[in-house]
Curated annotation (Swiss-Prot):
GO terms for biological process: cell adhesion; visual perception. It comes from the Eukaryota. The gene is xlrs1. This is Retinoschisin. The keyword Repeat does not apply.
Amino acid sequence: MHLPREAFLLALAGAFIFPSSQQEKRTQRDLRVVCFYQKDFRNGTKAEQWGKKTPTQIWRGCMSVCNAIVVCLFELGVSETWNSKSCKCDCEGGESPTEFPSIRTGSSMVRGVDCMPECPYHRPLGFEAGSISPDQITCSNQDQYTAWFSSWLPSKARLNTQGFGCAWLSKFQDNTQWLQIDLIDAKVVSGILTQGRCDADEWITKYSLQYRTDEKLNWIYYKDQTGNNRVFYGNSDRSSSVQNLLRPPIVARYIRILPLGWHTRIALRLELLLCMNKCS
């Protein structure tokens, strides 16, 4: 089965540079480029948010920087399946390809070289440092966080926060609750660190993760190697931080943490990790 006609290539993550010479290609070898197919990018519409570049221009620019970290995300919709255990991009020779990769659902077949299975370096997104603003962090039933609960808003879900109101506390204790982060721009997310409430024995013991690149797209569950929704194991006390790395990393603007189990109450402090191509 061929790729749906509305599927086009976008490129994300940081400033996008189009080298104009072989020398520029060499000097831009540390540029991070993220390529992925997005089902909702419709029928030849220009990628307005990416500097008015067409999908083909973006593809060629991406592939011209061969030493970049390349991550691919295939979003084929709810009714279609992508059975490959990895995704691939043709960046072998440093030349722009003349066509998109050939992709067939259900066949695990993609032309090109393997994408990055794991990030070489990570850096905190900025929950603990405060660079993530309160309005970037939301939760289920947030309009009901009044009175005492107004001190335990989702914006309090910051790693190592101390004092009263030192975590996000869910007002309801069931599996329909979630905490959501808007990264403003799509980024390469490579891991998550979690803690419980600092002043009481309340924490999340396990959770799942959803993500998407646009609010108009369906949520995608992060899967394990068997194709099932991955269950991440969380905390066992109030203060220790537990790290879960994403292998492979994901391209996302929106991230949702969905608690599956908890001790006493759903309580969360966290930090997200971003994928870096070099230690900085």
